Every structure is written in structure tokens, then in C-alpha cells.
């Protein structure tokens, strides 16, 4: 491989390690298929495969064969990989902050429309998704329930153009879109408690057609993403 190839693999390796550090992929999670992961990362399958092999070699991932096989996360954030996370954040931090701020405004706008346009069917669906989130186990199950609830809010806006913009932005911001980063085991309980509280407030505002409240709550809620990234960045710089 050329030096450029190796440099790109280095960058993708750092990105995948950071994905584990910020809880995009939680311990025990299976990563997307190689082809899908390469598309999310914006690189070729050869580069993605080489980066995955590095993570397997470092013990962060393990390969399982068979119909239910794939690449699985083995542990949360090994202290030996702090430098990789620090490098990624140093390179990407301005763009991440910019994207996160844009995300708060996009989700605020979608929540305002949902509060204006929701139907009785939307109300029933939102309340069911909220209950599903509350009942889900901590970790990956609740991360997935969070994603499904936010998709229901987007659908309740009944605006295809803005919905497409929001979903496209999510894909640019995280490689697990439409799911969101879920932090580490130390920060997760407080984050999930806050998310549950704000979900309840947001769904109530949408159901009650409180447009301004829905927008304000959604913007504050989506700030969680940047807060999780900043916490991981600070840990990487101080460990």
C-alpha cells in the first residue's frame, strides 16, 4: 500500500475507536456489515477492512463467523487507545461542534412542525414509543428505543423536505444514524435519566400542540450529543 493508503487507514482506525469511546457502538454490539460501514465512513471496503483488522488485533473487536457472525465490540474504551481518540477530536472538533449546533436547530424545527401537524395516530405512536423507551433496558436497547422515538417525532412533522434534511444531517454526524451516541458506562445512567425526562416533556409538548415549547425542549435535548462528545474529548486529553 502507498503511504496515502496507510494514512487513510490510520484515520479510519481512529474514527472507529472513537465510535466505541463515545458509545456509538456499545460493548457487545455488532458493527454494520463491512459494505454498509464503508459507505457510512465514506471510504472503500478495502480501507474499512484494514481498519477493522487493526481493531481486532488490538482486542477492541472480535470476529465471529456464521450466519449471526460479524465484528463485535469487546470492551468499552481501553486506556491504551486514548491517543487515537485525542487525534480524532483534535482533527474534527470544529466540524463536530458546527454539526452538533446545526442538529439542535434542525431538531427544534422538526419538533415545532410535529407540534403543529401531529395527528391522533401520531399521538398514539409517540406515546407508545415513549413507553418503549422507558421500559427498555439500559444501554443498547434504550439507544435503539431512543432512535425509534426520534423517528416517530420526525414522521409526526409531516414535512418530507425537512425530514430528509434532518436524516441526511444525522448520517453526516454519526455513523450509526439515525441512532445517537450513548456515552460510556460511567456517564450513561445520568444521561439516560435526563433523556427520559426530556423525552416526556417533548412528547407532551407535541401532543398539546405547544409549538414553541416543543422547539425549545428539542433543541435542549439534542445538546446531549455535543455534551457526550465533549466529555469524551476531555477524558482523552487528560488521561
Residues covered by each model-derived region:
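A generic short alpha-helical patch detector that favors 3-5-residue windows
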Residues: 4, 8, 77, 98-102, ...
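A ubiquitous short alpha-helical element
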Residues: 1, 90-97, 111-115, 134-137, ...
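Conserved amphipathic alpha-helical segments that form helical-bundle/coiled-coil interaction surfaces
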Residues: 103-183, 198-199, 216-225
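C-terminal effector-binding regulatory domain of bacterial HTH transcription factors
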Residues: 211-239
Amino acid at each position: 500500500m502507498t503511504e496515502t493508503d496507510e494514512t487513510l487507514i490510520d484515520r479510519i482506525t481512529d474514527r472507529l475507536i472513537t465510535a466505541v469511546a463515545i458509545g456509538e457502538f456499545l460493548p457487545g454490539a455488532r458493527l454494520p456489515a463491512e459494505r454498509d460501514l464503508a459507505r457510512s465512513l465514506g471510504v472503500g471496503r478495502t480501507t474499512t477492512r484494514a481498519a477493522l483488522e487493526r481493531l481486532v488485533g488490538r482486542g477492541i473487536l472480535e470476529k465471529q463467523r456464521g450466519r449471526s457472525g460479524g465484528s463485535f465490540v469487546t470492551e468499552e474504551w481501553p486506556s491504551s487507545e486514548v491517543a487515537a481518540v485525542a487525534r480524532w477530536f483534535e482533527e474534527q472538533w470544529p466540524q463536530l461542534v458546527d454539526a452538533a449546533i446545526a442538529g439542535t436547530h434542525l431538531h427544534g424545527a422538526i419538533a415545532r412542525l410535529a407540534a403543529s401537524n401531529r395527528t391522533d395516530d401520531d399521538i398514539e405512536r409517540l406515546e407508545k414509543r415513549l413507553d418503549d423507551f422507558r421500559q427498555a433496558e439500559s444501554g443498547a436497547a434504550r439507544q435503539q428505543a431512543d432512535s425509534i422515538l426520534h423517528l416517530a417525532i420526525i414522521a409526526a412533522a409531516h414535512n418530507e423536505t425537512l425530514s430528509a434534511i434532518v436524516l441526511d444531517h444525522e448520517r453526516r454526524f454519526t455513523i450509526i444514524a439515525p441512532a445517537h451516541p450513548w456515552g460510556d458506562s460511567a456517564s450513561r445512567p445520568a444521561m439516560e435519566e435526563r433523556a427520559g425526562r426530556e423525552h416526556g416533556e417533548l412528547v407532551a409538548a407535541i401532543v398539546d400542540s405547544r409549538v414553541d415549547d416543543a422547539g425549545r425542549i428539542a433543541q435542549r435535548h439534542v445538546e446531549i450529543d455535543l455534551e457526550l462528545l465533549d466529555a469524551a474529548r476531555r477524558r482523552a486529553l487528560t488521561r
